[in-house]
From Swiss-Prot:
Keyword Translocase applies: yes
Pfam families with a match to the protein in the record: Rnf-Nqr
UniProt family annotation: Belongs to the NqrDE/RnfAE family.
HAMAP family assigned: RsxE_RnfE (MF_00478)
Name of the protein this chain belongs to: Ion-translocating oxidoreductase complex subunit E
Protein EC: 7.-.-.-
Domain of life of the organism encoding this protein: Bacteria
PANTHER family, per database record: ELECTRON TRANSPORT COMPLEX PROTEIN RNFE, ION-TRANSLOCATING OXIDOREDUCTASE COMPLEX SUBUNIT E
Transmembrane segments: 18-38, 39-59, 69-89, 92-112, 128-148, 182-202
Species of the source: Yersinia pestis bv. Antiqua (strain Angola)
Recorded GO CC terms: plasma membrane
Length: 233
């Protein structure tokens, strides 16, 4: 497997920052009340990861190891401030909805972790790809959890999508369940923990099935080879 494919596989599934490393749980649980909020924060985090990894990788040869962490934090804070201003300018409704969790991306362990563990040791292109893969992995986990909570809590999907995509996105709203009253458990923090637990369990089941399938394939290949050898004799 090439390095690029390995980075994508690690970021999106095998080493998913939310479902495997369990990093950034504070925004994951707090913002994932709707699919729109989850998608907005996930995309913002992905953009920060890509830009931060690129900058750290480009400057890695000139940053003294003794002061690298403060410099990384300064880079991350600069990128997050820029992203925050962009969201404020072009998606003000989403900016109000996400609130403090946009600037809190600075303290997200995913961002500083990838800068230190990968970007500081690898070329710019691969570092940017690593940031993209890790960000999209976190975004997918956020979106699935947000969609699950929104459907169970309000019976809708993509409610408030216009805050992220503009006024045309109001047509994306889907009424899936017709609830007389909202299911508050799904919308409150306990529902977020339960939903995350279900996602973790689902990933574990899928991983175990994939391992079993690979094991069966490895066992069947030698048997076929032995059968051909017996026929040849």
């Amino acid at each position: 497997m090439s390095e690029a494919k390995n980075l994508l596989a690690q970021g999106l599934w095998k080493n998913n920052s939310a479902l495997v490393q369990l990093l950034g749980l504070c925004p994951l649980l707090a913002v994932s009340s709707t699919a729109t909020n989850a998608l907005g924060l996930g995309l913002a985090t992905t953009l920060v990861l890509v830009c931060t990894n690129t900058a750290v990788s480009a400057l890695r040869r000139w940053v003294p190891s003794e002061i690298r962490i403060p410099i990384y934090v300064m880079i991350i804070a600069s990128v997050v401030s820029t992203v925050q201003m962009l969201i404020n300018a072009y998606a003000f409704g989403l900016y109000q909805s996400l609130g403090i969790f946009i600037p809190l991306i600075v303290t997200n362990c995913i961002v500083i972790g990838r800068a230190e563990a990968y970007a500081a040791k690898n070329p710019v292109g691969l570092s940017a790809l690593d940031g993209f893969a890790m960000g999209m992995g976190a975004t997918c986990a956020l979106f699935v959890l947000g969609a699950l909570r929104e459907i169970l809590g309000n019976g809708t999907l993509f409610d408030g999508a216009d805050m992220l995509l503009g006024s045309w996105a109001t047509v994306l709203r889907i009424d899936i369940l017709h609830l007389d009253t909202p299911f508050l458990l799904a919308m409150l923090p306990p529902g977020a923990f339960i939903g995350l637990g279900l996602l973790l369990a689902g990933k574990y089941v899928i991983d175990e099935k994939m391992k079993a399938r690979k094991a069966n394939t490895r066992v069947s290949v030698p048997q076929l080879q032995d059968g051909y050898a017996e026929k040849a004799l």
